[in-house]
């Protein structure tokens, strides 16, 4: 073989080897690239998975925190099975419309259930033990007629109505019926009330309602032994409580609200006025909101009450009885306003008592309102000296004395009850014929609540008010209430010629300004 041929062959061999090495290098590089690419992909997927997990955990934490921050809103409660009776369904719509119009009923129903009001007790199917108690009444009151179908359907309800409208049975009947028909054990109903007197009154009504049942009702409030109340809570199905004592018992571990299914706030506006908002929220947080049906009753509908309702109620049905846009008095009450000199009030009071408690009316119940405790004590002594049998309810008396005084008045042992505004809201004292305002209250709202102690449960009543120049800044607002109830405005009151405007100052707070309504308003022209 020639040398040239050998060199040529070696060259081809070297080229082939080089080509193989080159291909091997490319193959290795491709494998390396693929490996790096795969590692990058795995790393990215791992990172995405980690980020997704973190987001999920953050979302869960956020949802958990939100759930803990707002534990007060009640969840939708399973319906107790209310169905409209055939008798109610057959009623012509004109009859329903007439009832709603006559009683000035407004219903705001976010569920659009369109449930008809109950015009008779025969239109509702209740446990026989409850039906036997309420059958002694002629018909349901407007607040009962409208709210019962919604409450029996498991809905949260807000009732805006005047005091004395039958609110205790409005929530009591559906609540007790629910316990009886489902044979529920343990503490199921909690009603929170602003004052001891109102709590005891609600308790008495619920005891009457459950008289034929094995259910136990308990009232807890301040001013008496806590130890005795703790003992009485054993095996209770229904508890009526004032906010302060309720918080005490919860803090002591003497009471658990885990099993509460029916929570009632009575006189919600009054409780906010008395500064119980934080106590109420604290109570809400200790209930099982998933199983809770919440009811709120209030005489007025201010911003603070609306905010409270939006916090812990679940799409509530709002039932309003009467014109709630303006402060209004019960039209069944004859209002008499007499303008006198301040020094004539005591003499005038004695004259009025002889007038309203004479002849066949000598045993009529008369409720007298004083403004301050010292005034109440002085007037009580005046009446005793003039041979009047009188009971008194004011802040200087012990709880036992106040309870005894109310009991004597309710039973007719005394026909005069002297009170400060502690008794002006919510107290249901049957058959009060006359309310006398010896001293006008600090606000016209309190005036309306005071006179609402008479004319209850469909009856008529008289409210006689002694008005002096010291209260002239309230004359305009008082005249509005009188006109709204179709009551005469005395000429002496018109002479004050004022309309009250409420003002507010960041440092001073709320105050009132007298405006002379006899002057022509200044006309402002815009170019």
Curated annotation (Swiss-Prot):
Catalytic activity: ATP + H2O = ADP + phosphate + H(+)
Gene Ontology cellular component annotations, sorted alphabetically: nucleolus; preribosome, large subunit precursor
GO function term, MF aspect, one: RNA binding
Annotated ranges, domain Helicase C-terminal: 348-497
Domain Helicase ATP-binding: 148-319
Residue stretches of biased makeup (Basic and acidic residues): 12-24, 45-71
Record field: compositional bias (Polar residues): 72-89
SMART domains associated with the record: DEXDc (SM00487), HELICc (SM00490)
Keywords: ATP-binding, Helicase, Hydrolase, Nucleotide-binding, Nucleus, Ribosome biogenesis, RNA-binding, rRNA processing
Motif range (Q motif): 119-145
Compositionally biased residues, Basic residues: 1-11, 25-44
Record keyword rRNA processing present: yes
PANTHER family: ATP-DEPENDENT RNA HELICASE DBP3
Cited function: ATP-dependent RNA helicase required for 60S ribosomal subunit synthesis. Involved in efficient pre-rRNA processing, predominantly at site A3, which is necessary for the normal formation of 25S and 5.8S rRNAs.
Family as reported in the entry's similarity comment: Belongs to the DEAD box helicase family. DDX5/DBP2 subfamily.
Identification of the protein by name: ATP-dependent RNA helicase DBP3
Gene: DBP3
């Amino acid at each position: 073989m020639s040398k040239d041929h050998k060199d040529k062959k070696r060259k081809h061999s070297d080229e082939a080897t080089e080509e193989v090495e080159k291909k091997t290098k490319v193959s290795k590089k491709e494998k390396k690239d693929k490996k790096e690419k795969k590692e990058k992909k795995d790393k990215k997927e791992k990172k995405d998975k980690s980020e997704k997990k973190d987001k999920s955990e953050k979302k869960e934490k956020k949802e958990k925190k939100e759930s803990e921050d707002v534990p007060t809103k009640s969840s939708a409660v399973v319906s107790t099975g209310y169905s409209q009776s055939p008798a109610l369904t057959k009623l012509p719509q004109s009859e329903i419309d007439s009832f709603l119009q006559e009683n000035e009923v407004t219903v705001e129903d976010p569920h659009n259930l369109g449930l008809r009001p109950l015009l008779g007790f025969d239109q509702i199917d209740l446990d026989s033990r409850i039906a036997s108690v309420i059958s002694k009444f002629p018909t349901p009151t407007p607040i009962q007629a409208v709210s019962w179908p919604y409450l029996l359907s498991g809905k949260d309800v807000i009732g805006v109505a005047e005091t004395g409208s039958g609110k205790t049975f409005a929530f009591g009947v559906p609540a007790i019926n629910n316990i009886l028909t489902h044979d529920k054990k343990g503490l199921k109903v909690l009603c929170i009330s602003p004052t001891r007197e109102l709590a005891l009154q609600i308790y008495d009504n619920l005891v009457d309602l459950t008289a034929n049942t094995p259910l136990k009702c308990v009232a807890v409030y301040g001013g008496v032994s806590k130890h005795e109340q703790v003992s009485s809570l054993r095996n209770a199905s229904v508890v009526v409580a004032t906010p302060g004592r309720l918080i005490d018992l919860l803090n002591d571990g003497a009471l658990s609200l885990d099993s509460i299914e029916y929570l009632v706030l009575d006189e919600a506006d009054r409780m906010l006025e008395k500064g119980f908002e934080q106590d109420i929220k604290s109570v809400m947080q200790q209930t099982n909101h998933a199983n809770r049906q919440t009811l709120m009753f209030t005489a007025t509908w201010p911003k603070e009450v609306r905010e409270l309702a939006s916090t812990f109620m679940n799409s509530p049905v709002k039932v309003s009885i009467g014109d709630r846009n303006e402060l209004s008095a019960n039209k069944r009450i004859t209002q008499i306003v007499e303008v006198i000199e301040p020094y004539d009030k005591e003499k005038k009071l004695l004259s009025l008592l002889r007038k309203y408690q004479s002849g066949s009316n000598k045993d009529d119940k008369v409720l007298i309102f004083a403004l301050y405790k010292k005034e109440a004590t002085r007037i009580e002594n005046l009446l005793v000296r003039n041979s009047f049998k009188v009971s008194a309810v004011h802040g200087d008396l012990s709880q036992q004395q106040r309870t005894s005084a109310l009991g004597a008045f309710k039973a007719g042992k005394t026909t005069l009850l002297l009170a400060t505004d502690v008794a002006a809201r919510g107290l249901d004292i049957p058959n009060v014929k006359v309310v006398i305002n010896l001293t006008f209250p600090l606000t016209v709202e309190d005036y309306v609540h005071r006179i609402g102690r008479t004319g209850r449960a469909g009856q008529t009543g008289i409210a006689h008010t002694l008005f002096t120049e010291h209260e002239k800044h309230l004359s305009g607002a008082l005249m509005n209430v009188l006109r709204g109830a179709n009551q005469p405005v005395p000429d002496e009151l018109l002479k004050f010629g004022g309309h009250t405007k409420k003002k507010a100052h960041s440092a001073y707070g709320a105050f009132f300004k007298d405006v002379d309504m006899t002057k022509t308003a200044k006309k402002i022209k815009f170019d």
